[in-house]
Design a protein with these regions (language model features):
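Extended hydrophobic-aromatic, low-complexity segments
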Residues: 1, 37-39, 112
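Long extracytoplasmic/lumenal interhelical loops at the membrane interface
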Residues: 1-32
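Generic hydrophobic alpha-helical membrane-span motif
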Residues: 7-9, 39-42, 90
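N-terminal low-complexity, intrinsically disordered patches enriched in charged
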Residues: 10-12, 42-45, 111
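Short, structured secondary-structure boundary patches
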Residues: 17-20, 42-43, 58-62, 100-104
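Generic recognition of well-ordered alpha-helical segments
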Residues: 24, 28-34, 47, 74-78, ...
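Hydrophobic transmembrane alpha-helices and their immediate junctions
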Residues: 32-75
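Transmembrane alpha-helices of multi-pass inner-membrane enzymes
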Residues: 67-112
Length: 112
C-alpha cells in the first residue's frame, strides 16, 4: 500500500497511534496527490452515472436492483468519505458498491 496507513501497519504502536484527518479525500491527497484524488473521484462519478444509465435502460428486475444499489451506495460512500475515515475503518462498507456493480455487469453480460 501507500501512505500513512501502510506506515501505521508496520509500526509497533498497537492502540492510538493512527492519527489521520476525518476526511478520506484529504488523506488521499496527502498519500497520492491531487492526481490520485481526481482519478478516484472520476472513477466514482463514472460508476454512479453508468449505474443510473443501466437502471434506465434495462427492464430486468435483478439488473435494475443491482444498478440502483451500486449507484446509490457508491454515492453514499463517496459522501461519507468527506466526513469519516471509510478507507481506514470500514473496508467492508467500501466494497459493497463495487460488489453490486460487478453483479450488475455480470447480469448484463449474461442477458446478451
Amino acid at each position: 500500500g501507500i501512505g500513512s496507513v501502510q506506515n501505521y501497519m508496520y509500526s509497533n504502536v498497537v492502540f492510538g497511534g493512527l492519527k489521520v484527518p476525518h476526511n478520506d479525500y484529504v488523506q488521499m491527497s496527502c498519500d497520492s496527490g491531487i492526481i490520485g484524488v481526481v482519478l478516484y473521484l472520476l472513477a466514482v462519478f463514472v460508476i454512479i452515472v453508468h449505474s443510473f444509465v443501466v437502471y434506465q435502460k434495462y427492464t430486468d428486475v435483478s439488473i435494475k436492483m443491482c444498478a440502483i444499489v451500486a449507484g446509490s451506495s457508491m454515492a453514499g460512500v463517496a459522501l461519507t468519505m468527506y466526513t469519516d475515515n471509510v478507507v481506514n475503518y470500514s473496508m467492508a462498507t467500501l466494497s459493497y458498491p463495487f460488489g453490486f456493480y460487478g453483479m450488475m455487469l455480470g447480469l448484463i453480460k449474461g442477458e446478451k
